[in-house]
Amino acid sequence: MNKELTPEQIKEQKVYLEWGLTQKEYEYICDKLLGRLPNYTETGLFSVMWSEHCSYKKSKPVLKLFPNKNERVLQGPGEGAGIVDIGDNQAVVFKAESHNHPSAVEPYEGAATGVGGILRDIFSMGARPIASLDSLHFGEIDNARTKYLINEVVAGIGGYGNCMGIPTVAGEITFDDCYAGNPLVNAMSVGILDQSHIQKGQAKGIGNAVMYVGAKTGRDGIHGATFASADFADDKETQRSAVQVGDPFMEKLLMEACIELTNNHQDWLVGIQDMGAAGIVSSSCEMSSKANSGMELNLDMVPQREEGMSAYEIMLSESQERMLLCVKKGHENDVKKLFEDYNLEAVVIGRVTEGHDYILHHKGEVVTNIPVSTLTDDVLEEPSEERVPQRILDNKNKDTWVPQLSSAKETLEALLQQPTIASKKMFTETYDSQVRTSTVVGPGSDAGVIRIRGTKKALAMTTDGNGRFIYLNPEVGGKIAVLEAATNIISSGALPLAITDCLNYGDPNDPEIYWELHQSINGMAEACRTLDTPVISGNVSLYNENNGEAIYPTAMIGMVGLIKDVYRTVPSFVQNTGDKLYLVGKTGNDFNGSELQKLLNNKITGDLNDFDLEKVNSYLKNLLVTMEQGLVSSSHDLSEGGLGVSLAEMVFGTDKGIKVSLDMKKELLFSETPGRLVVSVSKDNVAAFEEIMGEDITEIGEVQVDHQLDITLTDDNFVAEVSELEKLWEEAIPCLMKSKD
């Protein structure tokens, strides 16, 4: 920790560079914004508020490409979370966040506090969190370090979420070498509220109180936002102090107190915001900026759990379980009493002021006096260079890779043991998916489904991201990411409403990485417009590199859908013997980036085939109509491993089997053409189903009594015992996790 250097020493020693500011930014702050040298505390404030994590200075120009409005959207990007109207004066609130860098350094706390932070975003909007999801990407399970990271991250997510009493109902876990040194830990939370309870993160009304509530402030997490905006080095031990430590029991109390305040005492409250990245400085500045007001804080009043904390440390701390409130003058004691009933501190630390200045007092001195806008609105945005990676240019000229297989059965057996495809039960069982007793469908299905109490409705939710596809073709891969999420939602019988995202990429200063970001957002934005799923919230996590090696560009899409009648929820597993099986969508030679390509070649190469998104959207809409009419018994989307893996998964955990005859060669059984599903339909509903779906379906077989997978292809056929396939699928990951390296 640097001692309190003078402004001149900061300039001379270039300390600001260590804190993440560039030379150009520092000079701009001195010469254009302040007309003087910033002091130690002010330099710290600029360094975190101008970090990519807080300012989006690199990504903002391309994030503007996303659609973020339609008739259902009540709150888009810019607040703690997005909000969508679901009828009956209710709304769903959701958001996703990344905690990648902290989880690589201190995986348990990194993952746990990622969950805690996203939950605070939800209840800061006035909503009660009803479900959590995650999207986790690790290196291959072939070394002790990766196994340690996996176990600790899963334990951290489960430990925090279970203590909070919020079910973890869905998610994904994938494995690729590129994530070995920089795992991705993306957390998503979903909440429900009455529309009359919606809150804003704003501090307006001259003389109104700024109140600090929750846990005391310590030295944990200082410069966490800067840490999240930089590349990794080998020596991660030195970065542990930037990782926060969570207390879920404190957060549970904080959540209940905040919900009581927002639901029952709105007349006391002006605004509320989570203290997340960059702690007090970020929450207070953002609340002032949104209200176009000033703020004056006395840092001596901030509850502190460590002695001798400087203004710099107090402002930059990312201690968990804290919120900032703007309370109407005269109601300070009311709020104090409410939080005391939950054994929580609530302290007035400042006031909303006239004008636009941000003033901080500490130990009798003014340690900061700058315009709010310099921290929030005047960030120096520089256009980024873009360059098409050579691998993309090379791939354009290559022939489509089509594998040569000797045995469909042996290939299926091998694919079911690929870690990305294999059962994740040993991890998901760590999570409580049934707490609150509203879970209709939990982990292991296409989407998690939560009943909305007091109504017939339910919400379906999913997280999906495939970095391999974006790596091979960012624009097409971006479209596939959104479509995969929508397919999962529709497969559950739900209408897709909107998305949140976590955009996990490498160093944006690399022109090739920035090109990947830009092109993939183009693809995602096109898909969002076509599917009418606006982006209502999200998160950008850049600098995901380890010693100069970037991860695959990985866009995680979190999507929520509405089921009008919970009794029309469609399961992912076959239900009735004799039901007809249909393949929805057409199958092509889509093997590049697939699990099959990785299995056979141990690497992914080539380009992706583009596809007709309008056509896919048209038949997905028709499929949803059939589901809402109760014509579909079960449905499962086709993703990793293609049709072969999906057919097997549909009978796992059941006592039934499947018999199909396919007009395709064995290789196509494992193609990963996007936008496809397998559905089962009872014989009574076949005529109505076929009339609605028309030419977009192919009858392929039926559900049978025998507990077997019986597949006939044009050049191969096999019968496999479901119990044997399921054993391979279930034991693959436990076996890898136990193996000696």
Swiss-Prot record:
It is an enzyme of class 6 (ligase). InterPro entries: PRibForGlyAmidine_synth_PurL, PurL_linker, PurM-like_C_dom, PurM-like_C_sf, PurM-like_N, PurM-like_N_sf. It catalyses: N(2)-formyl-N(1)-(5-phospho-beta-D-ribosyl)glycinamide + L-glutamine + ATP + H2O = 2-formamido-N(1)-(5-O-phospho-beta-D-ribosyl)acetamidine + L-glutamate + ADP + phosphate + H(+). One of its GO terms (biological process) is 'de novo' IMP biosynthetic process. Its main location: cytoplasm. It comes from the Bacteria. Its EC number is 6.3.5.3. The keyword Methyltransferase does not apply. The active site is at H53, H99. Mg(2+) 2 binds at D121, D274. Pathway: Purine metabolism; IMP biosynthesis via de novo pathway; 5-amino-1-(5-phospho-D-ribosyl)imidazole from N(2)-formyl-N(1)-(5-phospho-D-ribosyl)glycinamide: step 1/2. One of its GO terms (molecular function) is magnesium ion binding. It is found in: Cytoplasm. Mg(2+) 1 binds at E97, N539. Pfam families: AIRS, AIRS_C, FGAR-AT_linker. GO terms for cellular component: cytoplasm. ATP binds at Y56, K95, D501, G538. The keyword Magnesium applies. Keywords: ATP-binding, Cytoplasm, Ligase, Magnesium, Metal-binding, Nucleotide-binding, Purine biosynthesis. Substrate binds at S98, H99, N100, H101, R120, Q244, E318, S319, Q320, S541. Part of the phosphoribosylformylglycinamidine synthase complex involved in the purines biosynthetic pathway. Catalyzes the ATP-dependent conversion of formylglycinamide ribonucleotide (FGAR) and glutamine to yield formylglycinamidine ribonucleotide (FGAM) and glutamate. The FGAM synthase complex is composed of three subunits. PurQ produces an ammonia molecule by converting glutamine to glutamate. PurL transfers the ammonia molecule to FGAR to form FGAM in an ATP-dependent manner. Monomer. Part of the FGAM synthase complex composed of 1 PurL, 1 PurQ and 2 PurS subunits. Belongs to the FGAMS family. This is Phosphoribosylformylglycinamidine synthase subunit PurL.
